[in-house]
């Protein structure tokens, strides 16, 4: 019986902590959501431009090396 309690107790504690965390969480309001969405969009745009410029630089270098 002691082994069963030892096996089940961590799962029970995890479920209790998870339930408490979910009860404390709140949804962001419209202003906070827009701020997060804007920051994410700017991040995607910056990463896209970096990838574009890296590819733009590597295409001529690759053509010079391969010599097509």
Curated annotation (Swiss-Prot):
Per the UniProt topology annotation, the Extracellular ranges are: 62-68
The answer to whether keyword Transport applies is yes
Which Pfam families is this protein grouped with?
SecE
Q: What is its main location?
A: endoplasmic reticulum
Q: Which family does it belong to?
A: Belongs to the SecE/SEC61-gamma family.
Q: State what this protein does.
A: Necessary for protein translocation in the endoplasmic reticulum and multi-pass membrane protein biogenesis.
Specify the protein name.
Answer: Protein transport protein Sec61 subunit gamma
Task: Record the organism.
Answer: Branchiostoma belcheri
Q: Gene name?
A: SEC61G
